[in-house]
Structures are given as C-alpha cells and as structure tokens.
C-alpha cells in the first residue's frame, strides 16, 4: 500500500515533525512493506527533522495561490465571483492543487490537525476535492475542530473523508453532533507515542527544580485586546524567580527563522537577566525537545505538542490555551480542564496566570501521580489508533 502524508508544515514546527515521525513509525511497524511519501510545505525546514520512515519527500505547497492564471481561468474566476465568492475562491484554490504525482499513491492522510479549526477551510477543502476526483481515499488524522468552527461548507467537505480521527473528545462530540462523518473515531494524538532521544540527555543538562516554559508570538493573536503576551510572560516569570528558588528553562517548539518561539523566548530571557534562566537551542529535533521537557520538574506551555511531550513523560503541565485542542486534551487526561488550562483570552495582566500557577503548584504532585497512572494506557491507545487506518 502506498500512503501519502500532506499538510505537513515542515520540521521546524516540531509538532508537525512529531506527528509525521510517530504516524509513519506506526504504519511501518505494522506493515513494513508499505511506502510513505511526504508532501511537505517546506522541504528546507525538514532538513532539521528526523523522519526515518519516510520513503520519499516532495515539496508541494498547495496553500500558495498560483502565480499565473490563464485568460480562460481568469474569465472563469470572474464569472464564478458574480454567482458566489465562495465558488470563485474554491476554483481559484483548486488551481494550486494540481500535481501529476498525486495519482501515484493510494491513501492520503492529512496530518495538519488544525486545518479545519481556523478560517473558512477552503484551501484544505480544495485539496481534498482534488484527491477525491482522482479516486483516492482520504483521512483527516488527529484533528481539532471547535463546534463554533463547523460551518455548513466545512461539514459538507468533512463528510467526504473515508476516516476522521479526532484527537480529543470536545472535537469528537462536536463532529458527532453535526453528523460530519459516519467514519469518525476518537484516539489520542500520535505524538503521545514519540520516543525520547536519550543522547541529548548526555549533552544538555537540565538543573534540578527546573520549570520548563514555552510561549509563542502566535498566542498574542488570541490574548486580551491591548495586552502584550511578551510583557506579561516576562513579569510572570520574574514573579516565579522572586518567589521561589526555581530555575527556568525557556523551550521553543516552533523554530522557524522569522517567527519561531526562540525569538520571543530570547527576548524574555534577556529582559529577565538572571543566571537561573536559560534558553534551549533552536536546533533540536522533536525527540530531543521531548527529552529536555521530560527532565523538567513542571511545565507551562502554549504549543500543543510541547505540552504533549510533557504530559506523555508525566511532567505536571499547566497549559496556556487558545483553542479547543488544549481544553479537550486536558479534559480527556484529567476529566476536566479546570485549573489545568489558562485561556489566553483571559490573560490581560499577570494576576490571572500567577493565581492559576499558585493553585496548580499546590496540586502539582497530585497531577504527577495521576499522569504516572494514566499515561501508559493512554499512550497504548494512541498506538492502537493505526488499526483504524488499515480498516478503510
């Protein structure tokens, strides 16, 4: 069987790397004769990753509009726009989805879990339609979609997938309620199964009593109006330094040169100016970041797959949440997201994160014990999710 992954944003997004690495390993462990092709949006970025089970890779960024349209195509776009802007957009996006090599593979797996969570989803839908025209089976793996994101157009497109794997119950319940797809299942994100690169344990020391911290400039887009997530994060961490003897390790998890986490974290470290604050290099792989996170005493983070690295290694984790996925994952692990997720929309000063941090700190060891008991079966469930793929 020839499988193909698409909507992979590149390995400088180490959540994307973790999904591709684990999902490809799960396929190969069960069916080693299978071939897996990766359609990547950023081949240059993939050079920083570690994807041993990918047989072939091709850069194909269907999210970029075609640079040139023919006269006939322009006329068609103009005609469609008079009838419906949606129809015109769908046709325009479909022009970017043409690729002769798409005929070569049997099953296409969308590994971009957030594709239907933000915006109108027209680009993702256009690519799915193109694959369906070619008679291909399509799978939406590890998705998160809020009920508020489910437009009539999205539901129509979601119905055409041969399998949808929701990664948390809030998404599963929303899709079930909307009857978005009869082939809908619920399994943990495959990144919960990511292995740890033990070599980095020897080369990168994590001090005792270390708090791991991750934030990104992306979070600022969802924060309370008029607030600076960088300023609030800096003062919040200054409070921790002043009120405890904790060391603070700033851990990037998306390391793109222009807008990676390392930029905002580097500025925060410089502003704090403390010998107890350090920044993890932006050159690590997903497995290496997981190794670092696993040795922290606790973790506070915004990037979903950084928090998954912490959860899966039984590190007590307080999430800075900005979408349904953070609430859903916490709920599935602990039975509730209360006290475990700080909604970024409610952060307008340091008072909220400090208050939630202190509450979390008082229950930290309770959370650790729960993770130690809960995680083995949860990770095994994530591994077993691959059997759903072989049933379609």
At which residue positions do the language-model features occur?
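Active-site anion-handling motifs in enzyme catalytic cores
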Residues: 1-392
